[in-house]
Amino acid sequence: MRAANLTISIPYLGCDKNCPYCVSKMTGYPKPNSGKLRRNIDKTKTLARAAQVTNVMITGKGEPTLNWNTLLDIIERFQEWPVELQTNGLLLAKHLDKVNTLAVYGLDVVAISIDKIEQFNDFKDLFKRIQDVGMTSRVTLNVTKMIPRTATFNYFISICKQHNIDQFLLRNIVAPTHAQVSEYTEWIKENTSQAHYDKLVGEMNVCLDKFGLFLRETEFGMKIYDYRGVSITRSDYCIQDSSTVNNLRSLILMDDGHVYTNWYSKASRLF
């Protein structure tokens, strides 16, 4: 059994952003157990090595930076791998000194989720601080009706260049396959447009065909390019639940301290 990555869900201590397309609100919250999570870290590392994991992604059912001490502990204990943090960026933008702390503990990539154009400017000092401490910044642009259709792919790349953003991910917002109908799935249905996402992808493909440099392709089909000095890719389906017979998308160390191979299946628990 091989796994593309190890994903660690920091035990939930709330969220400071109320995203109407929040995946966690559609898939539920396991009961957090920080003690069990810490006790299972060594086992998880052994499994990750055996599965030839190449990177660690830290995320959360809430905002991981709100559980600050646990976050730092996890980063420090997994720093033998490249470590990425997925965050809404709000806490870090208010307390830029925390970016320095993350770097000291061994974080490599800060991936910031954005769903409004003005957030690029709101986070300009955060992007600069990430660059100053030598970490890599990524913007994940969540494509909904909150993003104007008039905004082009090249427009977003120009913003990335302006703010020294290293990586740009275009993300299609869809409801998880196994999610029950709720106000959140209905919001996605009413406030996303496949045509809007396809328009940006079409513009991206034209730019990449003319001036892009293909860099690599991940095991699960994400193609990564260099365009104007920015790393470019896209995610057509935003949930990491696809696996093959021999290769897992992720090993998942969940809030409850157990390791799973699927976000939605309790039966996928390994230990």
Q: Each predicted region: which residue ranges?
A:
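Short, small/polar residue-rich loop motifs at catalytic or cofactor-binding pockets
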Residues: 245-247
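Radical SAM/AdoMet-radical enzyme domain recognition
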Residues: 44-58, 67-160, 166, 170
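Canonical Radical SAM [4Fe-4S] cluster-binding loop centered on the CxxxCxxC motif
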Residues: 1-40
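Glycine-rich phosphate-binding "P-loop"
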Residues: 32-33, 57-60
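Hydrophobic "anchor" residues
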Residues: 259-261
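Residue-level recognition of short loop/turn positions
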Residues: 61, 88, 256-257
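Radical SAM enzyme [4Fe-4S]-AdoMet core and its adjacent flexible, acidic
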Residues: 31-36, 115, 119-121, 125-243, ...
